[in-house]
A protein has these predicted regions:
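A mobile "lid/hinge" subdomain adjacent to the ATP/sugar-phosphate binding pocket shared
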Residues: 251-295
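Glycine-rich phosphate-binding loop of actin/hexokinase-like ATP-binding domains
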Residues: 151-248
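Short beta-strand-loop/turn "lid" adjacent to the catalytic site in phosphate-handling enzymes
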Residues: 72-121, 139-141, 147-156
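Short glycine-rich, Thr/Ser-proximal phosphate-binding strand/loop in the N-terminal lobe
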Residues: 16-61
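Glycine-rich phosphate-binding loops at beta-strand->alpha-helix junctions
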Residues: 318-340
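Phosphate/ATP-binding catalytic cores across multiple sugar-kinase/actin-like superfamilies
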Residues: 184-187, 191, 294-315
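Extreme N-terminal starter segment of soluble prokaryotic enzymes
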Residues: 3-9
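Glycine-rich phosphate-binding/hydrolytic loop that grips phosphoryl groups
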Residues: 327, 341, 348-388
Length: 388
C-alpha cells in the first residue's frame, strides 16, 4: 500500500470497458482499465505512470459488477478503501444538468430514465454507481457528457417537430462526448499558451462527434437526442432519413427496436466495409480492398463537410482540434483535413506524422492533435464538490 492520504477515484464506463484512475493527494497513483468485458476481459494499469507487468492480464469480468470487483482488488494495493473520500463517474446522459451533481437517490432515479436514450453506456454507469456506493463510504459525484452542451442556443438544440411533443418528452439535441470536447479544448489551449475564440473539436474514436465552440462554450454539436445522430461511426449509422426506419420495419418484417439495433450495431463503417476499426480499414485499403477505400473516403468526406458547416456557423475559425484514436494515424489526419485550404486549414507536412501533442498547421488556423483526458477533466471540474 503506497499511501493513506485523502483519495479520489474516477470511474469512466464505456460500452465494453471501465477506465479507472486513483488520485492520491492530487497526484495520479494508478491509471487503469478493464476492457473487453465479457468472456475475454483484460486488466491493465499504470502505477505512477510506469507500466507494470500486469498489462493486459486476463481477469474474471463477465459483467460490469465483476469488472468493478477487479478494480477494487487493484485499489486495495494502493490505498485503504476508507481513505477514498470521493468517487467521480462519467455518465453519458445527464438530461438538462449543466454541472456535476452529488449523487442522491433522486438524482440516480432521474439518470436511470435516460437509459433508453444511451443504451450502450447508461445502464453500465448505473450498475457501477450502485456497486461503488455500496462498497465505498464516500462522496459520489456524476459528471455528464451532455452538460458541456446544456446551454447550446435554441437554434442548435431544437428539432422542428410539434412543440407540444418536444416539451412533453423533452425531445431536443442534448449532444454527447462533452467531457471529451471540453478536455480537448483545455489541452490545446494549455499547449498553445493562449485562448481561442472560434474552435472546432473532433472526437474521433469508435464514436465520432464534432463540436463548435465559441469563447469556451459549446454552440453546436453533431450528436443529438441520442448518440446515434450525427456523423457515420464505427458501427453506428449516424444521421439518416427517418423514413428509412418504418420502410425497413415494413419490408423486412422487423420491429422498430430491431431496426434501431441494426443502426447502432451493424451500420456505419462496419456496414460499408465489414470492419469498424480504422486500423483494419487502412490495412484493407493497403491490400486493395475497394470497400475499405470507399468507407475511408466516405468517413473523411462527411467529417470535412461538417467542419465546413461549423466554420460557417462560427463565422470563421481560429483552431481545429483532433483527439481520439483515429487522430493518432497520420494517414487519417491527411485524409480528413486535405482540401480545406480555402478555410485556412493548411497542413504542415513536416510535422504531420509527429505524436501528440503537436500543432500540424502552417495556415492561419491552428490544428492541434491532442489526447483526450476525460478523467483529468472530471477531477478538475469536481474540485468544489469533492472538497465540500
Amino acid at each position: 500500500m503506497t499511501g493513506n492520504g485523502n483519495s479520489t477515484l474516477i470511474i469512466n464506463a464505456g460500452s465494453s470497458s471501465v477506465k479507472f484512475r486513483l488520485y492520491l493527494n492530487s497526484a495520479i497513483a494508478v491509471d487503469g482499465v478493464v476492457d473487453a468485458i465479457g468472456k475475454n476481459a483484460r486488466l491493465s494499469f499504470v502505477k505512477n505512470k510506469v507500466y507494470q507487468e500486469m498489462q493486459g492480464v486476463r481477469v474474471q469480468a463477465r459483467n460490469y459488477t465483476e469488472a468493478a470487483n477487479e478494480i477494487i482488488n487493484v485499489l486495495e494495493n494502493f490505498v485503504a478503501l476508507k481513505k477514498i473520500k470521493s468517487v467521480v463517474y462519467r455518465v453519458v446522459h445527464g438530461g438538462l444538468y449543466s454541472e456535476p451533481q452529488r449523487i442522491t437517490p433522486s438524482v440516480l432515479k432521474e439518470l436511470e430514465k435516460f437509459a433508453p436514450l444511451a443504451p450502450l453506456h447508461q445502464p453500465q454507469s448505473m450498475t457501477l454507481i450502485r456497486f461503488f456506493m455500496q462498497q465505498l463510504k464516500a462522496r459520489h459525484i456524476a459528471c455528464f457528457d451532455t452538460m458541456f452542451h446544456a446551454k447550446m442556443p435554441a437554434l442548435a438544440n431544437t428539432y422542428a417537430i410539434p412543440r407540444a411533443l418536444a416539451q412533453k418528452y423533452k425531445i431536443m439535441r442534448y449532444g454527447f462526448h462533452g467531457l471529451s470536447h471540453a478536455s480537448l479544448l483545455r489541452a490545446a489551449e494549455q499547449y498553445a499558451g493562449k485562448k481561442y475564440q472560434k474552435v472546432i473539436t473532433c472526437q474521433l474514436g469508435n464514436g465520432i462527434s464534432l463540436c463548435a465552440i465559441r469563447n469556451g462554450k459549446s454552440v453546436d454539436t453533431t450528436m443529438g437526442f441520442t448518440p446515434l445522430e450525427g456523423l457515420p461511426m464505427g458501427t453506428r449509422s449516424g444521421s439518416i432519413d427517418p423514413a428509412i426506419i418504418p420502410f425497413l420495419c415494413k419490408h423486412e418484417k422487423k420491429t422498430p427496436r430491431q431496426v434501431l439495433s441494426l443502426l447502432e450495431h451493424e451500420s456505419g463503417l462496419k456496414a460499408l466495409s465489414g470492419f469498424s476499426d480504422i486500423r483494419d480499414l487502412l490495412a484493407g485499403e493497403k491490400r486493395g480492398d475497394a470497400r475499405c477505400k470507399f468507407a475511408l473516403d466516405f468517413f473523411a468526406y462527411h467529417i470535412r463537410k461538417q467542419i465546413g458547416a461549423y466554420v460557417a456557423a462560427l463565422n470563421g475559425l481560429d483552431c481545429l482540434i483532433l483527439g481520439g484514436g483515429i487522430s493518432r494515424a497520420p494517414k487519417m489526419r491527411q485524409r480528413i483535413l486535405s482540401g480545406l485550404e480555402t478555410l485556412g486549414i493548411v497542413l504542415n507536412q513536416k510535422v504531420l506524422s509527429h505524436e501528440s501533442p503537436v500543432c500540424i498547421s502552417k495556415g492561419k488556423v491552428a490544428i492541434w492533435i491532442v489526447e483526450t483526458d476525460e478523467q483529468g477533466y472530471m477531477y478538475e471540474i469536481t474540485k468544489g464538490l469533492r472538497e465540500v
